[in-house]
């Protein structure tokens, strides 16, 4: 059986495609760089982090964008006629006054690892844009056209516009073609496909919260009209009817289903195997209950599907409830490399599993300056939306132990470095070494930001020598705490126990759609040049344990 989620941690809005025997899956990254991870599989069960699409933080400038803005809902497709991969993605610039100012772009590559073409601007009519490669060679871009006018149904409807690959521009204005297949409202995430005589439109409805779902419609004409699937929704965490068209809230916690491990299931994309089997990937979450807080963010899950005799897509078991265990395909099992638990930084390149907010990690993290270490150059404070030195990886379990060994000699109080548990620039816990002017020497202490409110735990600070120091973060379900050591054997706890559940979309006021990260960090708020050397980064997580 395939165990869900297939890609745990902050990996939302999955879009899947196949080229030959290889399956590729793209997810959203929002303010994090590198952007748009591509996961690879041979059997739909085992997945590896393969590459990233966006690696130039000058070409795609995310600096100064608030949390949860940036790269939204990439659409990854493979056009067999052209032997070409397409990625359509949006850069969300602002959600102020619910205007959702977004710019949508298209890029292509012959190889999934690139190089990718220069971005082609499509439009700014709405978000979650995707592309259809029609049988006749024409192409169409669909997206949610966000509604801002008073007196009109929110949040809007699915619109479509033709795209000219020759001219590299869309033709005319987008036209509305679909307003949903259920009464759940909050339609988004359209994917348009062609199978046989039908065009199928797959969407998410209900908001990307507890009433989330996958719906479908179909038409024999690309411009419609589209008929609703009589079973809608076809995949969800909360089966049953609901009418929420007038409710703009995306979270809708009243629809939490205590009978399901997987919550928020929706935003789907399907693929057919070489043997004709059908699988659908979708986002999902596993909240702490009863708090209903999803510390791991929105994750990627998969469901086995089938086509009915009357050409509708259904879950293989005939239900529409997302399952945590899914039948495997007939493809031969193919284990793939996993991200290593221990990184001793002996490689000449930084691992592709590291991310940084708004800038590329390589702009401040150097594995060549001192072989066997990563040197992190300090920049702005960790609350900044500009240039912040946080070298992070995704938290994939709420049962984890993260350890590092650091060499750092702060010279002024604006210098600090250490280990961090991070949701966004307004929510983090940082065990830091810094220069204490009061003590006249280096010290370690914890600094905590909770929805923008800063607390420095000076009562538990400890003076330390300027020698190598070990730092460790424990995450045990709802409880998280830090420890430190001189020798890496005898650790002592520092500070209090923190509430892991608060690192979540539901609790954090300044972000909505990402997930929790753990990592190494350094700040130099004077000259942006003082650095810390880290000998290793060890991440041990038990991904088999349930969230609760």
Walk through the language-model features, giving the residues of each:
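Carbohydrate-active catalytic/glycan-binding domains of CAZyme proteins
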Residues: 1-548
């Amino acid at each position: 059986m395939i165990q869900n989620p297939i890609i745990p941690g902050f990996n939302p809005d999955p879009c899947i495609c196949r080229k030959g025997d290889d399956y590729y899956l793209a997810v959203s990254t929002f303010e994090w760089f590198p952007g748009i991870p591509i996961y690879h599989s041979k059997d739909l069960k085992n997945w590896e982090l393969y590459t990233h699409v966006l690696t130039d933080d000058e070409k795609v400038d995310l600096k100064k964008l608030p949390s949860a803005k940036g790269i939204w809902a990439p659409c990854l497709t493979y056009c067999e006629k052209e032997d070409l991969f397409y990625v359509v993605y949006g850069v969300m610039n602002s959600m102020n006054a619910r205007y959702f100012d977004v710019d949508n772009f298209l890029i292509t590559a012959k190889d999934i690892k690139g190089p990718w073409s220069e971005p082609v601007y499509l439009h700014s009519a709405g978000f979650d844009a995707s592309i259809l490669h029609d049988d006749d060679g024409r192409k169409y871009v669909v997206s949610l056209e966000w509604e801002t006018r008073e007196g009109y149904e929110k949040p809007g409807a699915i619109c479509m516009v033709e795209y000219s690959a020759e001219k590299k521009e869309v033709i005319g204005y987008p036209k509305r073609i679909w307003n949903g297949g259920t009464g759940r409202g909050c339609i988004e995430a359209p994917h348009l496909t062609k199978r046989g005589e039908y065009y199928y439109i797959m969407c998410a409805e209900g908001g990307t919260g507890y009433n989330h779902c996958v719906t479908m419609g179909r038409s024999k004409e690309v411009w419609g009209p589209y008929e609703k699937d009589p079973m809608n929704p076809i995949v969800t965490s909360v089966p049953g009817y609901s009418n929420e068209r007038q409710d703009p809230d995306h979270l809708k916690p009243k629809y939490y289903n205590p009978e399901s491990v997987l919550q928020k299931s929706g935003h789907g994309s399907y693929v057919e195997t070489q043997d004709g089997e059908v699988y659908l990937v979708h986002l999902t979450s596993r909240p702490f209950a009863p708090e209903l807080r999803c510390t791991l963010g929105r994750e990627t899950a998969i469901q086995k599907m089938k086509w009915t005799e009357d050409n509708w897509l259904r879950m293989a078991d005939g239900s529409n409830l997302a399952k945590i265990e899914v039948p495997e395909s007939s493809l031969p099992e193919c284990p793939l490399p996993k991200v290593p638990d221990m990184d001793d930084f002996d490689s000449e390149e930084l691992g592709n599993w590291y991310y940084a907010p708004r800038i590329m990690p390589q702009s401040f993290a150097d594995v060549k300056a001192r072989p066997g270490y990563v040197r992190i150059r300090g920049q702005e404070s960790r609350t900044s939306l500009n240039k912040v030195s946080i070298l992070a990886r995704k938290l994939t379990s709420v049962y984890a132990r993260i350890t590092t060994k650091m060499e750092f000699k702060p010279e002024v109080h604006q210098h600090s470095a250490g280990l961090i548990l991070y949701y966004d620039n307004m929510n983090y816990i940082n065990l830091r070494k810094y220069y204490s002017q009061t003590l006249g020497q280096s010290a370690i202490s914890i600094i905590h930001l909770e929805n923008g409110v800063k607390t420095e735990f000076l009562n538990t600070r400890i003076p330390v020598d300027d020698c190598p120091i070990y730092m460790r973060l424990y995450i045990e379900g709802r409880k998280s705490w830090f420890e430190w050591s001189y020798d890496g054997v005898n650790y002592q706890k520092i500070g209090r126990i923190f509430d892991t559940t608060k690192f979540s979309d539901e609790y954090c006021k300044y972000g909505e759609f990402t997930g929790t990260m753990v990592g190494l960090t350094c700040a130099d708020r004077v000259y942006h040049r003082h650095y810390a050397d880290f000998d290793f980064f060890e991440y041990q997580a038990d991904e088999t344990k349930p969230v609760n």
